[in-house]
Amino acid sequence: MAREFSLEKTRNIGIMAHIDAGKTTTTERILFYTGRIHKIGETHEGASQMDWMEQEQERGITITSAATTAQWKGYRVNIIDTPGHVDFTVEVERSLRVLDGAVAVLDAQSGVEPQTETVWRQATTYGVPRVVFVNKMDKIGADFLYSVGTLHERLAANAHPIQLPIGAEDTFEGIIDLIEMNALYYEDDLGNDPHVKEIPADLKDLADEYRGKLVEAVAELDEELMMKYLEGEEITKEELKAGIRKGTLNVEFYPVVCGTAFKNKGVQPMLDAVLDYLPAPTDVPAINGVLPDGEEAARHADDSEPFSSLAFKVMTDPYVGRLTFFRVYSGTLNSGSYVQNSTKGKRERVGRILQMHANHREEISIVYAGDIAAAVGLKDTTTGDTLCDEKEQIILESMEFPEPVIQVAIEPKSKADQDKMGQALAKLAEEDPTFRAETDQETGQTLISGMGELHLDILVDRMRREFRVEANVGDPQVSYRETFRKSAQVEGKFVRQSGGRGQYGHVWIEFGPNEEGKGFEFENAIVGGVVPREYIPAVQAGLEGALDNGVLAGYPLIDIKAKLYDGSYHDVDSNEMAFKVAASMALRNAAKKCDPVILEPMMAVEVVIPEEYLGDIMGNITSRRGRVDGMEARGNAQVVRAFVPLANMFGYATHLRSGTQGRGVYTMQFDHYEEVPKSIAEEIIKANGGNNKED
């Protein structure tokens, strides 16, 4: 089967935004205009095509990035819909990793919102070019130029309108194209056929002003254009478009368009901007990877290169089972063929290849470089794995995922649920790298951990619906940590005689605090073989094993150094096990000397509220042991930034809603660990039965 669309005519884009900026509706309209849907689905009626999990339709938010393919003006556009809620930033990171460009959707009333900033920063990290779509121009309070201003103020983005709106709120009727210098009016409800007219007289001056600003901004990025501009020569519209494309691809310039997806206005010109200014797979740098011999190598977007791809999402589909979404970076892949999962060192068979259209799937026999598709039949592949040609193996740069910050205990309601719960949790953990399920060795409870309350709510909900498992969920528990504040030299000695061969391990270790974020560091400073070389790894393993169960309240120990500097051994009785135990005893003994403390996760919280609630909200943050880090006015709202312990943030959403009559919003994400105040540390130790027991 020959390639249907050339690489140059392929676009892999994401739609990214703050929750509720109208991202899913925007994607819907794209699918409608590109002929993939015959009836428009409304998110607020729960009938959207992209939101295909039941909970997404109920809650009206997008949780899973469904990958969809569409066609527009002879181009293939693969769209990944990304969630806007902060608990799902891993989904956003995961999709940005495999995109070439993105459309950032803003709400015309609010402009840049907290989650927009988070997603924008992630896109900048991955060097993703962006077009900005100012949506909801029909909404009360919509203000296009204010929204563009927020891009400059809050994101320091070099963003410039390539369109202006004609009217706003309920008088929004079309857009001015600053490149063609004409006006598009939408006169039918579906916006299928906009009428091209002259720019209205009352907007002519504004259009000239912004056309001038656009030309100047583009000229600044290109020497040749700058010379023409300074010499007063006319810059043609072809040169202007080429300049915008170059600046956008270099992530130095962001074209801004406007419209209202809900009222079907401005979506097609936004699609044109995607084709005109966002990159084809051939415009982005080749992806780097590591060959089996450790050498670095690149893979280019080219069908003739060896096959290489990255699995970026695993899902369980009720009809076809396990689906692995992957992005092809080089080469081609036929259904029914074998590939190598080079990350895990496993051979996998690709049963079928599907191209997804939200929740309708199309089977295809081959995928080419630059494509996004889903494979059926892969057994061992998880998110972030490389799939490649068996003969030309490579491991592509993988993805890094944040550690979970919130934990809850979960119990099956019946014996029948118990067996199914284990399988369900394993499946969910396979799909989502930021979700963990484990059994507490001491209490036997099953604990699940994730990125926030909503994240865990939705996973428990999925367990009930998809796997038919009923479960009771406990109160959220914070993932505390422990560390040392002082250095000390400590002995660990394990001697046991029980007839016949005994056990003997003896170490002296200097423990001390490490820099924040450095983790555990082990140093072997043994001289003269007082502890034989073959037992050193056992000492390190003994310490690493004991770190999971801290000395105060049993929380994992982080950011400590251990230097093994002395010890002794017995010719007959010493063995690896004895040195492992001796090392873990030394760590226990360090509790008395190293001033251990409990650390708690601190969240960076941003609250956006109307001015009149400012005093109450600030007071409430302080009462939650938070400290305010900064404030600013944003439009007619106040933004409060603070660091608050996670332990005091449970139930905050409900408090904020009731305290501001539903007008306040907040986002939070893990920032760093901090020492817990003494009185609270005592409560935590007491609640955990104290862990500092003699072994």
UniProtKB/Swiss-Prot annotation:
Natural source organism: Listeria welshimeri serovar 6b (strain ATCC 35897 / DSM 20650 / CCUG 15529 / CIP 8149 / NCTC 11857 / SLCC 5334 / V8)
Subcellular location(s) per record: Cytoplasm
Protein function: Catalyzes the GTP-dependent ribosomal translocation step during translation elongation. During this step, the ribosome changes from the pre-translocational (PRE) to the post-translocational (POST) state as the newly formed A-site-bound peptidyl-tRNA and P-site-bound deacylated tRNA move to the P and E sites, respectively. Catalyzes the coordinated movement of the two tRNA molecules, the mRNA and conformational changes in the ribosome.
Pfam family, one: GTP_EFTU_D2
Protein name: Elongation factor G
Major subcellular location class: cytoplasm
The keyword GTP-binding is annotated on this UniProt entry: yes
One cellular-component annotation, GO: cytoplasm
Keyword annotations from UniProtKB, A to Z: Cytoplasm, Elongation factor, GTP-binding, Nucleotide-binding, Protein biosynthesis
SUPFAM superfamilies found in the cross-reference section: EF-G C-terminal domain-like, P-loop containing nucleoside triphosphate hydrolases, Ribosomal protein S5 domain 2-like, Translation proteins
Domain (tr-type G) ranges: 8-282
Signal peptide boundaries: none
Family: Belongs to the TRAFAC class translation factor GTPase superfamily. Classic translation factor GTPase family. EF-G/EF-2 subfamily.
Residues given in the record as GTP binding sites: 17-24, 81-85, 135-138
One Gene Ontology MF term: translation elongation factor activity
Keyword Signal (UniProt): no
Biological processes per GO annotation: ribosome disassembly
Gene3D superfamilies: 3.30.230.10, 3.30.70.240, Elongation Factor G (Translational Gtpase), domain 3, P-loop containing nucleotide triphosphate hydrolases, Translation factors
